Amino acid sequence: MVVKKVHERSPLRVFERSIHGGLGTGNLGVVLSRPGMGKTAFMVGIALDALMRGRKVFHVALEQSVDHVREHYDEIFTDLARTTHLDDAASARLMVERGRMVHTYLGHSFSMVKCRNALAQLREHLHFEPAAVMIDG
């Protein structure tokens, strides 16, 4: 299956319709639940949906290492590629890896000022303009 078909058949399309087309630019969505209920996996699924549409994602992890977050992306992408019979999964994986930036703030070191500064540096030095920011913690 081609990436476009994977996008069209995503369960997120139902979610978007239920909130009248999605959150929209500048709006905030919040996912809350007890630890271990799948919040990170849910957010990675949303991020992968954006990444596979060619959009960039900035993922901020407050309680997990960068490697741990990347493992979530790898596992969920691999499952998606397998279950959808994704054509040219290697190219799609490369697009995902190039389109995401993962930062971590362990030990209660996160602040919105630090997040804004990191985004400003990404824009200025790497020309990385994310369409979505995921704050996971």
Feature annotation, model-predicted:
Residues V31-S33, T104, G137:
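A short, structure-level motif marking secondary-structure boundaries and short turns
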Residues G22-R82:
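Walker A/P-loop NTP-binding active-site region of P-loop NTPases
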Residues R9-G22:
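Pre-Walker A adenine-sensing motif
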Residues S18, G45-D49, A118-H125:
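A generic secondary-structure signal
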Residues M1-K4:
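Charged, amphipathic alpha-helical linker segments immediately N-terminal to NTP-binding catalytic cores
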Residues E8-L12, K39-T40, M112-R116:
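A conditional alpha-helix N-cap/helix-loop micro-motif detector
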Residues Q64-I135:
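Conserved inter-motif catalytic segment of the P-loop NTP-binding fold
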